[in-house]
Amino acid sequence: DEQHSVIRAALLHDIGQLRLPRELIGKNDLNEEEKRVLDNMQAEGFRILDQVYTGDTSVKRICAQCYRCIRDFQDGKRPDLRISTEARVMAVAQTYDQMTAMQFGQNPASEVMAIKHLLDHPEVYDANAVQALIDSIHILAPGTSVELNNKEKALVLTLNPENVLRPVVLNFRDNSIIDLGLRGNRELEIIDIMKTMDNRHVMDTEALKRQGFQVEEPKYVEVPPG
């Protein structure tokens, strides 16, 4: 069925690149000759899929449509979105995976930057597929530590249903609460997710309560003198 076809396509879409020259692996800025080599490798992969899935063209079709959609966008062309839903879903998943995965010679993009890229190009990446990805990975769930573009560190307090990248956050430096969804804060944005929690901050629980947030305070134990 369609779901199985998407799964197979996701696993096999780059099978043709197994023979890709080492110097082209992970390279983004390709010249025309290198693009031709990559196209030939992909075409060989599609021929392999034809041989493996005799009589079933769905896997090859999804892979080919996804490849052409992303490739046209990279070449500055407007992709033809008259492609299958499965190919649209895979284009979103593949782009997110490629941007956030470890790559030889360069650092991966943050999850935030990858989602921002997908949201910024609705002419390429299907909005429903992008939203499904956001819903599945819970990228900025409450409790997530983040870095802002002003170098400040903050903690996500509540989600923004209108824009997942602009939640309400708590600034670690001064315990101020910042609603990134407000127009007055439009110059601030999250640029990365912190992988480790900074335990050096002190949270002002009273300030949170005044803003209407429910705070579970730790139980303190009195230590007898002496």
Segments (PLM) and residue ranges:
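Histidine- and acidic-residue-rich, metal-dependent catalytic cores
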Residues: 1-226
